[in-house]
Amino acid sequence: MVSLSHYLVLGAVLFAIGVVGIFLNRKNVIILLMSIELMLLAVNINFVAFSYYLQDIAGQIFVFFILTVAAAEAAIGLAILVALFRNIRTINVDDLDRLKG
């Protein structure tokens, strides 16, 4: 039987992979977005695990809202990335300094 601690360890590992992805790849915008989405997924796993453990459906409902916001965030982030790539021809974070005064 899979216990609560298994889900919490899985969530912690996924969150740690996301944090490591952010710290190791600060130059590529796509990897930054993927790492943030992985961290959100880890939080969602913890919400569902605690919701199941406490026999409360509110955590699972909250996960649907988080997934909706995460999908919208990913779509907007990728749209901005495509627009920047068309203008600047790069996705390197260091080259995205046009708004600096």
Swiss-Prot record:
Q: Which cysteines are joined by disulfide bonds?
A: none
> Enzyme group, top EC level?
translocase
Compartment annotation? Cell inner membrane
The record's annotation in InterPro entries points to: NADH_UbQ_OxRdtase_chain4L/K, NUOK/Mnh_C1-like
Q: Which residue ranges run through the membrane?
A: 4-24, 30-50, 61-81
User: Could you confirm whether the keyword Zinc appears in this record?
Assistant: no
Topology within the bilayer: Multi-pass membrane protein
One GO BP annotation of this record = ATP synthesis coupled electron transport
Xref: Pfam families:
Oxidored_q2 (PF00420)
Any idea which UniProt keywords this protein has?
Answer: Cell inner membrane, Cell membrane, Membrane, NAD, Quinone, Translocase, Transmembrane, Transmembrane helix, Transport, Ubiquinone
Q: Name one GO molecular function term.
A: quinone binding
GO cellular component terms attached to this protein's record = NADH dehydrogenase complex; plasma membrane
Reaction catalyzed: a quinone + NADH + 5 H(+)(in) = a quinol + NAD(+) + 4 H(+)(out)
Q: What is its EC number?
A: 7.1.1.-
> Which family is annotated?
Belongs to the complex I subunit 4L family.
Query: According to its UniProt entry, what is the function of this protein?
Result: NDH-1 shuttles electrons from NADH, via FMN and iron-sulfur (Fe-S) centers, to quinones in the respiratory chain. The immediate electron acceptor for the enzyme in this species is believed to be ubiquinone. Couples the redox reaction to proton translocation (for every two electrons transferred, four hydrogen ions are translocated across the cytoplasmic membrane), and thus conserves the redox energy in a proton gradient.
Matching HAMAP family: NDH1_NuoK
Task: Note the subunit structure.
Answer: NDH-1 is composed of 14 different subunits. Subunits NuoA, H, J, K, L, M, N constitute the membrane sector of the complex.
Protein name as catalogued? NADH-quinone oxidoreductase subunit K
